[in-house]
Every structure is written in C-alpha cells, then in structure tokens.
Amino acid sequence: MVQHLTAEEIIQYISDAKKSTPIKVYLNGNFEGITYPESFKVFGSEQSKVIFCEADDWKPFYEAYGSQFEDIEIEMDRRNSAIPLKDLTNTNARIEPGAFIREQAIIEDGAVVMMGATINIGAVVGEGTMIDMNATLGGRATTGKNVHVGAGAVLAGVIEPPSASPVIIEDDVLIGANAVILEGVRVGKGAIVAAGAIVTQDVPAGAVVAGTPAKVIKQASEVQDTKKEIVAALRKLND
C-alpha cells in the first residue's frame, strides 16, 4: 500500500505555501497605452480582454487604468488558498467532471473518481479503486487496491490533531453509500461496510459490518458474489 504524507509534513506544506487568490477578469474598454504586469495572463481582442491574475496584483492595475474600462466582471472562487487542485495531466485514471482532488493526493493507476467526490491532501486512492459520487476522502485517508467507496461515504481525515492515525482501507473492501469511517479505523481486506454504517472500531478482514455504531453481522463469504462484485470494465481506460 502506498505510503501517505505524515500530518507534520502536510502541516509544513500548508504553512509554507504561498497563499493565492486567483481571479479571472472580463473587460470591455479602451486598452490603448496599457502596460500589463508580467504576472498577468491576457487574452482577447482590441476591445475586450480576459485577464488571469492574483487579486493583490489587480488592485494597483485597476487604480492605474480603471477609467479606461467600460464593463468589468470578476470571478473569484477562493481566498488565500494554500493548496491548489492536483494537476491530472499524467494521472492514469478515470476522473469525472466535478471531482475535487487536491495537490499531494495520490491517485493510482486504473482508479475511478466520480462526480462530486472530494480527495483531500495526503489521501491515497489505490489501484483500481472507485470513489463514487460525493464521497469524501479526508486528509491522509488511504485505500488499497480494488476498493469501492460508495456514494456519499466519508473516510475521515486526520491532519489536525496531527497525532491522530489515518483511516486505512485494505484491498477489495466494499463501503456502502453514506457510510462513515472514523479516524484511526482500519478496515481489513475483503470486508464489507453496509450503507449508512458508522464505523468506530477496526473491522476484521472478511467481515460484514452494519449499524450505528457498526458491528459484525456476518462474513463476506456469506454474501452472494453478484452483490460484492468489483467490475473491471468500469475501470477500463482507452486501449
């Protein structure tokens, strides 16, 4: 299983990161004689521009040239952000639109991350693992291979306090929709967590747990294969 960053390493990364407030500015007006700072990315025509820049850099620019602009629209979706979204260019996985994956998360080969899923810094999505819609992997939460994390499920994150142990999900585990796995819990290989379960203690390999708090109700070997099948075709990428 891939090793994740320690809590102390994540805290240091966030502390040292240059905080960013990126904005996108749409402009109509007269741009004659305008000099753009090197930090600006500028696109457009003689009458209209789109500028990508930091909010702090925009203010003095606007003070200098604002009288030349007729229409202004500014988009801002974060403030003093420390952690950017992950660059997925070289990620060999299926990532659907609307997934939020932060830098320093690890997405292994053949994984699937569905719409609305959130993968926080230091989390690990194992090879062939599916993170379903609106599921959340908190900081340092780690899954093994061929895991299914159901829609709306939560694997609790542990960055603060830094002494807490992360959630560990071993290979071939099925986690039902809206289940919650609390910090420090380890779910053993081949186990099944029922939908809506609140898991507060370690789950033995091959066990089925359900309820609030979750308790062992039977063994995964007693569950029909069709109800616990991991479908390889859903993880297939282009040939």
Swiss-Prot record:
Its EC number is 2.3.1.89. It catalyses: (S)-2,3,4,5-tetrahydrodipicolinate + acetyl-CoA + H2O = L-2-acetamido-6-oxoheptanedioate + CoA. InterPro entries: DapH, DapH_N, Hexapep, Hexapep_transf_CS, Trans_hexapeptide_repeat, Trimer_LpxA-like_sf. It is an enzyme of class 2 (transferase). Keywords: Acyltransferase, Amino-acid biosynthesis, Diaminopimelate biosynthesis, Lysine biosynthesis, Repeat, Transferase. It holds the Pfam family Hexapep. One of its GO terms (biological process) is lysine biosynthetic process via diaminopimelate. GO terms for molecular function: tetrahydrodipicolinate N-acetyltransferase activity. PROSITE patterns: HEXAPEP_TRANSFERASES (PS00101). The keyword Amino-acid biosynthesis applies. Gene3D superfamilies: Hexapeptide repeat proteins (2.160.10.10), Malonyl-CoA ACP transacylase, ACP-binding (3.30.70.250). The keyword tRNA processing does not apply. Pathway: Amino-acid biosynthesis; L-lysine biosynthesis via DAP pathway; LL-2,6-diaminopimelate from (S)-tetrahydrodipicolinate (acetylase route): step 1/3. Belongs to the transferase hexapeptide repeat family. DapH subfamily. PANTHER family: 2,3,4,5-TETRAHYDROPYRIDINE-2,6-DICARBOXYLATE N-ACETYLTRANSFERASE, ACETYLTRANSFERASE. Catalyzes the transfer of an acetyl group from acetyl-CoA to tetrahydrodipicolinate. This is 2,3,4,5-tetrahydropyridine-2,6-dicarboxylate N-acetyltransferase. It comes from Staphylococcus aureus (strain Mu50 / ATCC 700699). The lineage of its organism: Bacteria, Bacillati, Bacillota, Bacilli, Bacillales. The gene is dapH.
